[in-house]
From Swiss-Prot:
Free-text function comment from the UniProt entry: Binds mRNA; thus facilitating recognition of the initiation point. It is needed to translate mRNA with a short Shine-Dalgarno (SD) purine-rich sequence.
Annotated S1 motif domain residues: 16-90, 108-173, 194-262, 279-348
Protein name: Small ribosomal subunit protein bS1
Gene that encodes the chain: rpsA
SMART domains (alphabetical): S1
Length: 391
């Protein structure tokens, strides 16, 4: 009888088989299962019920539940011809989890998982088994307190699988990086040269300011920060400041964007529109001498030209004979060209002279129409008085 019993056992369910059955009894430390097609009942110890820690079997199963498990051992009593299948539901869940995670790793897919615990080195998550997100793989940004993730469902990617050592490493940072790259590509495609947009000063260097314009940084060169001369970016902008910028150029291959704050600001000449008129006599300061005349600043950042013929009633060979930089002078406005931002001035017309000589209108016309040699551009006409102006 015993020999027949042993032979039937060998031909029956054996160790390593996968079986199904119905939960008949839930005890404190184990679950009794009626095995479909089996000669005995199955026993699932509490430690083999779940991939997670549980204090009671009732947390995961109840009587009448259909369960699937691996047979880890077959026990039988030859004398009484009784036995039991020792089962592991945990082993089967772990196997399914690894299979699922391997597929996601192979396809570089995103999964969602709940953070079950926050530890010093990172986050513990539930991915069908215990998974770990190291601190270095939590975010692309610095996060001081990881407790904000406790209990949250997060989007992650599988970074590493090692079933032999029961090791599952995941990355939330990889998902963020992928999303940031997608936003960056979309933004780069939507931007065009000449667009005026808003951004935030991200960092400052000696040569300019980097502006975050929505996931992409663009550079405002120090020469594009203001109409007036700027020594260092800190003179006009600060980190975190919201600014308006104009896109000067885009290189989508290298993801380099050149920006300008200066181009979004009114020029010094625009700031004085309506303030001065032809024939007004005003005060100014000599800022530069040239062979053909003197440049006089009549308002912060605005310079006009006094042609050499308009400096004195007497003939002079060079402006330096009667003028020097820094000298205060009275000037009369002979003409204003708003389109080209030019002002023609005369010192001579403000000086007393018994034999009054009228200003030569051809000289004024030549300057305003850009016929003089070495005529200044708007850059030549910008002084340094607005250095301390903040945007």
């Amino acid at each position: 009888m015993t020999e027949e019993f042993n032979e039937s056992m060998i031909n029956d369910i054996k160790e390593g088989d996968k079986v199904t059955g119905e939960v008949q009894q839930v005890e404190d430390k184990q679950v009794v299962v009626h095995i479909n097609g089996g000669k005995f009942n199955g026993i699932i110890p509490i430690s083999q019920l779940s991939t997670h820690h549980i204090d009671s079997p009732s947390e995961v199963v109840k009587e009448g539940d259909e369960v699937e498990a691996y047979v880890t051992k077959v026990e039988f009593d030859e004398e009484n011809e009784t036995g039991a299948y020792i089962l592991s539901r945990r082993q089967l869940e772990t196997e399914k989890s690894y299979s699922y995670l391997q597929e996601k790793l192979d396809n570089n897919e995103i999964i969602e998982a709940k953070v079950t615990e926050v530890v010093k080195g990172g986050l513990v998550v539930d991915v069908g088994q215990r998974g770990f997100v190291p601190a270095s793989l939590i975010s692309t940004d610095f996060i001081e307190d990881f407790s904000v993730f406790d209990g949250q469902t997060i989007r992650i990617k599988v970074e590493e699988l090692d079933p032999e050592n029961n090791r599952v490493i995941l990355s939330r940072k990889a998902v963020e990086q992928e999303e940031n790259d997608a936003k960056k590509d979309q933004l780069l495609q939507s931007l065009n040269e000449g667009d005026v947009i808003h951004g935030k000063v991200a960092r400052l260097t000696q040569f300019g300011a980097f502006i975050d314009i929505g996931g992409v940084d663009g550079l405002v060169h120090v020469s594009e920060l203001s109409h007036e001369h700027v020594q260092t970016p800190e003179e006009v902008v600060s980190i975190g400041q919201d600014v308006k910028v104009k896109i000067k150029s885009i290189d989508r291959d290298t993801e380099r964007i050149s920006l300008s704050i200066k181009d979004t600001l009114p020029t010094p000449f625009e700031n004085i529109k309506g303030q001065f008129h032809e024939n007004d006599v005003i005060e100014g300061v000599v800022v530069r001498l040239a062979n053909f005349g003197a440049f006089v600043e009549i308002a912060p950042g605005v310079q006009g030209l006094v042609h050499i013929s308009e400096i004195a009633h007497k003939h002079i060979g060079t402006p330096g004979e009667v003028l020097e930089p820094g000298q205060q002078v009275n000037v009369k406005i002979l003409g204003i060209d708003e389109e080209n931002e030019r002002v023609s001035l005369s010192i001579k017309a403000t000086l007393p002279n018994e034999d009054v000589v009228e200003s030569d209108p051809s000289t004024t016309k030549a300057y305003l129409e850009n016929e003089e040699e070495d005529n200044p551009t708007i850059g030549d006409m910008i002084g340094d008085k607005l250095k301390n102006l903040k945007l």
